[in-house]
From Swiss-Prot:
One GO cellular component term: extracellular matrix
InterPro entries, sorted: Leu-rich_rpt (IPR001611), Leu-rich_rpt_typical-subtyp (IPR003591), LRR_dom_sf (IPR032675), LRRNT (IPR000372), Mimecan/Epiphycan/Opticin (IPR043547)
Disordered, as annotated region: 64-101
Signal peptide: 1-19
Post-translational modification remark: The O-linked polysaccharides on Thr-60 and Ser-96 are probably the mucin type linked to GalNAc. There is one glycosaminoglycan chain, known to be dermatan sulfate, and it is probably the O-glycosylation at Ser-64.
SUPFAM superfamilies in alphabetical order: L domain-like
Keyword Disulfide bond among record annotations: yes
Name the record gives this protein: Epiphycan
Residue ranges of every copy of the LRRNT domain listed in the record: 106-143
Family according to the record: Belongs to the small leucine-rich proteoglycan (SLRP) family. SLRP class III subfamily.
Tree of life domain: Eukaryota
Subcellular location, record wording: Secreted, Extracellular space, Extracellular matrix
Amino acid sequence: MKTLAGLVLGLVIFDAAVTAPTLESINYDSETYDATLEDLDNLYNYENIPVDKVEIEIATVMPSGNRELLTPPPQPEKAQEEEEEEESTPRLIDGSSPQEPEFTGVLGPHTNEDFPTCLLCTCISTTVYCDDHELDAIPPLPKNTAYFYSRFNRIKKINKNDFASLSDLKRIDLTSNLISEIDEDAFRKLPQLRELVLRDNKIRQLPELPTTLTFIDISNNRLGRKGIKQEAFKDMYDLHHLYLTDNNLDHIPLPLPENLRALHLQNNNILEMHEDTFCNVKNLTYIRKALEDIRLDGNPINLSKTPQAYMCLPRLPVGSLV
C-alpha cells in the first residue's frame, strides 16, 4: 500500500517538473547595460514627465446674482489735490504748519529766522527761558508770557516793540548781555511788570520805567551823572529793592520811595550826602522803618561828616567813616 502511494506521488512531481517553463539566463554584465552613470540622475527627474490629468486653474468667482463691481466712486480732482497737499505738508507738534506766518501754539511765535521761539528756548507754562543761546536780539514771545529770562546772550539793544504786546509780563531778566541802548518806551507800557534785572551790561542811560516795579537791579553797568532821570523812582510806591552797584553814579537818586527796604550803591563815585537824603529834617520824630539795608561802601564819601542824615534810619549805612 505504501509502495503504491509513493509511486503516485512521484508521478505527480515528475509531471509538474516537465510542464514548467524554462528560464532564460539574465546577463548583468556592464557591456550589455545601456544606461551610463552620467544619466543616472535623469532617471529620477519627473519635472518634464507629461501628466495626463488636466490642470485646473484656481480662481475666485463672484457669487451668482448681483455681480456689480464694488469700486469707490472717483473723487473730484480738486479734492484729491487738497488731500495730496495736506499729506505732503509737514506738521509740528501741535498740528500747525511751519509755513504759517503767525504761530500761536504751544511753541510760540516765530523768530526772525522763522523758527518757533519755544523750540529755540524753553517754555514752561507762562515762563520762557532763553539763557545762553547766543541771541543778538529778543525773540518774539508768546502773548501769555509772564516771566522772561534771556541771560548770558549777546543782545545789544532793547526795542520798544520787543515787549509791546505782553500785558501779562511780570519779570524780565537780561543779565550778562551786551545791552548799551534801550528805547524810551521799551518798559513803560507794561502794566504788570514787577521785577527788572539788567545787571552786567553796558547801559549808560535808563529809559522811563513803569511805576509798578518792586525790584530793580541795574548793577555793573555804565550809569553816570545823567544816566538816571530826575525823580525816576519817586512814584514807585511798591519798590522794595534798588540795586545800582558798580556804576559811575556821583549822587544818590532822589527822592526814594517810602517803602524801599534795600538800597545798594557800593562801588560808585558818590562824594556827598545831604541831611534830607533819607530823613525829613522838618519832622524830627520821623522814622524810616522799612529802609534797613543801605550799602555805600566802595565810594569816596565819608559818612561821618553827615551824622544827621541817618537819625531816622533803623540801621546805619555800610560805608567808610574816615
